[in-house]
Amino acid sequence: MGEKLSMDYNENVSRLNEVLNLDTNFDIIRKGITIAGREACIYFIDGFLEEAIMEKLLEFFYKLKPEELPKTAQQMADHVVPYVEVSVMIDEDDILKNLLSGVTCLLLSGYDACIGLDCRSYPMRSVSEPSKDKALRGSKDGFVETLVFNTALIRRRIRSPKLSMEHMTAGRTSQTDIVLCYMENRVDRRLLRELKGRINAIKLDSLTMNQESLAECIYERKWINPFPKFKFTERPDAASAAILEGNIVVLVDNSPQAMIIPTSVFDIVEEADDYYFPPVTGSYLRLTRFLIALITLLLTPTFLLLFQNPEWVPEWLAFIQIKEA
């Protein structure tokens, strides 16, 4: 926990200016304003701000009268600010974390707290079908690099209050946002506790490779079991189906993929089209792929070994040998 804000407005502003290093960081903007005769300032990240929303809020703030200001910042956020996504922060670390995530922070003289206005708009690409995970049937949308859009794509498919999306962070410096998606009444509680414990125990400075870095921290590499411990998908319908089956889907900010935990060999060989076939047909196709993969893995090296050592070939398999003309 960092230091808490005080009632001294100038002290709060000076501390934030020093920590944010405004003289060097050109993209962190501080704008001084006056609200109902009081000194105030807003901090925001250039490129993350939805300007149309901020213009409306500033227009409202400029029209406020002194008698309309409540005694506390919490009352200001609850009853005065005409915006839905408003929060109150009293801890300096919380303010810095939210500000560097794109939240606009408002400091107002006479309050010992900061008002957070979530007016952010991330640079992003449009929702489109994944290039490496296409399906002949079904939806044509896919995950993007913006975390809240990915959670919305899952919420759109599972409209149940039992669907939980638990927010976590990892990385001391990067403070990467992570969301665990699962059904309250179907998830394996023991697995969920273990997964949350391992994420909380991560001591890395940053998750530079998103889910790949997270996966390496969660699972230790063991030569005894070489099979994958998780599955990646870029399709919201496949992720939603996995959640309804009792699995946990891990979403990481800045990544267009979802990590499904736990998984099995049969999950690795399935394709998105399998969900749109009857259960018997889908199971048959998955079993066929698994058998083909197993045969390819075992039969090819066995044939090469017997070809190089013909004396090992039994008589009933002599027909596989290549005979000279």
What are the roles of these predicted feature ranges?
Residues 288-304:
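Bilayer-spanning, highly hydrophobic alpha-helical transmembrane segments
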